[in-house]
């Protein structure tokens, strides 16, 4: 789903307006899922901005980040997608605060909640702070099978 979102949210005018799409994964196993996902798309992540953080003790701490270097021959910093991996749960207050913080007046936030069982996805959507929905936010909820085309599901929430 994240790669599909990256394809759909690509901005052809990035060079002039510097608009980026940020895709955030929120998962209690984000460290492992990040490694699987980044391993599958090594070349993309070598050229992309990304960061990894953990949500614990009611705060979100960014521990790792990457800025592309050595790609001047390709036109410099040209990938218009940023990636974030948050090791935590959508039920954590600091994670909800981060989603709310990300919903600036100019931002268009789409939250896709993709848990293995659809009833858990719906419960997670209902659990989100109501202020998030007041900020030009769209939520999409679905249950996902445990495997998609033979690959593990890389999910919990994307924005």
Model-predicted segments: where are they?
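Cytosolic regulatory regions of ion transport systems
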Residues: 1-159
